Amino acid sequence: MIRTVDIYDTSIIGVFATCTEDVVLVPPLTKPEVCALLEEVLDVRVIETLVNGSIVVGALSRGNSNGFMLPYGARAEMQRFTDIPVGILPDRLNAVGNIVFANDSAALVHPDLSDKALEAIARTLKVDVYRGTIAGIKNVGMAGVVTNKGLLVHPKVTASEREVLEKIFGFPVNIGTTNFGTQMLGSGLLANSKNFVAGSETTGPELGRIEEALGFLE
């Protein structure tokens, strides 16, 4: 099975797309064969959309099985989500995909987000929300990937951060990279509990680590 791909001819697929258990959001003009691969491998429905007029859909949105968070000013895109609950992050610090790290049970977010923003995330995604960092990085959304089966994060995650992540999500913390050593591995990985797709530069050992961490090894 093919598990590596480019979107817009680049391997940083997590910047341009994001997925949940049910859907994958991709920018318009994503190649049909790429959409077909994502649909088949991840077992999801493809939605083509801009977010705030931008093609960096993965950097600007974050969702789970309960809904999607979009940035301040993105109400024009809400009409594309007719069957998906959508919330708008009220803060100006709002590259949602970069600053929210979430699955169906919890979310870790940028430590500078306001209480109002945390309330909006909790209400839309229906999860408990916590402020924190991964490897000292505030943009937690790209510093790892979490699904309903596993957790993979930046290699420089600290012991105290590991403890917090394990408590929040209930999984052991695994470390890894994508795209031949990229430590902000969320930029090169789309995953749900059914499967994953990584950027085209991701190596065999990196793919093996992803499989192990996210629960795809028999």
From Swiss-Prot:
GO cellular component: cytosol
Biological process, per Gene Ontology: assembly of large subunit precursor of preribosome; cytosolic ribosome assembly; maturation of 5.8S rRNA; maturation of LSU-rRNA
Keywords in alphabetical order: Initiation factor, Protein biosynthesis
CDD domains reported for this sequence: IF6
SUPFAM superfamilies associated with the record: Pentein (SSF55909)
Gene3D superfamilies recorded: L-arginine/glycine Amidinotransferase, Chain A
SMART domains reported in the protein's UniProt record: eIF6
One Gene Ontology molecular-function label: translation initiation factor activity
Family indicated by similarity: Belongs to the eIF-6 family.
Record NCBIfam families: eIF-6 (TIGR00323), PRK04046.2-1 (NF003130)
Function noted in UniProt: Binds to the 50S ribosomal subunit and prevents its association with the 30S ribosomal subunit to form the 70S initiation complex.
Protein name: Translation initiation factor 6
